[in-house]
Amino acid sequence: MTQSYFELFGLEAKFKIDLAKLENNFRKIQSESHPDRFVTAAAAKKLKSMQLATLANEAYQTLKQPANRAKYLLELQGVEAIAETNTSMPADFLMQQMEWREAIDDAKNAKDIAALDNLLITMQRESDELNTELSLLIDNNHDYPAATNTTRKLIFIDKVCIDIKKVIEKLEDSN
């Protein structure tokens, strides 16, 4: 059996994790598997250390981001959070998405960085609420279908935050 990303870092397979422990264990694995430590080692040992370093990096990137961590946890439960065939979202969330996109466009057209900053704060609050919800749904209730919808919302929020930051950066660069 293959080791899960959580096991690799000595963490319990939960949504709410100790990020400091994740960081420390990642750095420890990276240090132990660094290529400089295997300069004189046999080719097989070099390859194994490189594979471990690559796995640790992939696992770390997955677990440090809440949306990726939720998606991975759902996959461990046999649930595909981002299925090509499952793109439905609640109507109220779809309406909210359109309102957020309009607000971004309006602020961009008005070159209103303050409005974009406020929208970013709103999105971060929404993200925090979804993270709390995911912790309850996954860790406490084991309600994976509901966690799937919440994960998809969080992925959308993350994308919107990235888009807002890009717009802010462009506006700041043009000033």
At which residue positions do the language-model features occur?
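C-terminal accessory/regulatory regions appended to core domains
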Residues: 1-175
